[in-house]
Swiss-Prot record:
Belongs to the IspH family. NCBIfam families: ispH_lytB (TIGR00216), PRK01045.1-2 (NF002188), PRK01045.1-4 (NF002190). (2E)-4-hydroxy-3-methylbut-2-enyl diphosphate binds at H41, H74, H124, T167, S225, S226, N227, S269. The active site is at E126 (proton donor). This is 4-hydroxy-3-methylbut-2-enyl diphosphate reductase. It catalyses: isopentenyl diphosphate + 2 oxidized [2Fe-2S]-[ferredoxin] + H2O = (2E)-4-hydroxy-3-methylbut-2-enyl diphosphate + 2 reduced [2Fe-2S]-[ferredoxin] + 2 H(+); dimethylallyl diphosphate + 2 oxidized [2Fe-2S]-[ferredoxin] + H2O = (2E)-4-hydroxy-3-methylbut-2-enyl diphosphate + 2 reduced [2Fe-2S]-[ferredoxin] + 2 H(+). GO terms for biological process: dimethylallyl diphosphate biosynthetic process; isopentenyl diphosphate biosynthetic process, methylerythritol 4-phosphate pathway; terpenoid biosynthetic process. Gene3D superfamilies: 3.40.50.11270, 4-hydroxy-3-methylbut-2-enyl diphosphate reductase, catalytic domain (3.40.1010.20). Its cofactor is [4Fe-4S] cluster.
Amino acid sequence: MKIILANPRGFCAGVDRAISIVELALEIHGAPIYVRHEVVHNRFVVNGLRDRGAIFVEELSEVPDGAIVIFSAHGVSQAVRQEAKDRNLKVFDATCPLVTKVHMQVARASRKGTKAILIGHKGHPEVEGTMGQYSNEDGGIFLIEKVEDIARLPMQDNDDLTFMTQTTLSLDDTAETIAALKEKYPAIQGPHKNDICYATTNRQEAVRELAKLSDLVLVVGSKNSSNSNRLAELASRMGIKSQLLDDPSDIQDDWFNDVKTIGITAGASAPEELVQSIISRLKEFGADTIEELQGLEENMFFEVPKELRIKEVN
């Protein structure tokens, strides 16, 4: 069997930054460091940080007063920020700057009293944080996941409306939903370019090319990773078998029936270390050739907070 590697794949700048913030906080301040929600959606990464002294919690009520807490890459609501301030928690914010950009769009709509529509997945922490940026009682923010949800929106054609999107959605699905929104609300405003992040976009485009050459596409990523799930779905939509896996132990013999070429990619929160361990396991199943596709070079970099950056330089 032949292995073909997608390019780009794996860590994005926002994930790199978020993990660095936890690592540096542990190095400088020592354990324990509390992290609200999984800092990124990858089991391997989270377990590694937990082993070093990070304590992952879902609510700030689980964090002792005055402790250090890190907000995950997915962002938090204004209510969570206020709670941390009220309790004198020392906060390091690992929210991805591209998520923060969407937060600012929502906050702007809230200040103006403009009704906002967010395209995203209900229950995802990024969506909860983004919805929680809207505080103007005279307007409102509404969540839709798909085209069919538009029919239940309560707004009128002449309302002052704007839309934004979760950063890790399917490009195709989101384009379809935006087109349907604009058809129903011709005057609706939105970002000049949709809010789906560069890494999500690049990895989906890379999977399109990978699927054309593969009999099976393996996506390295955790089941709670939105962008990893979208990669597996995209390959399946193209008629190619796909599997989402956390690590080599997930690999099953029957995946390789009639498979000559295996495509491998990784979600934005999956480290290259996992990809290489899966390649090693595939060699035991008979994979003997490895090819890496050419792809876009990513040079995006996001700084860590100043307090940690100074220590990092020293």
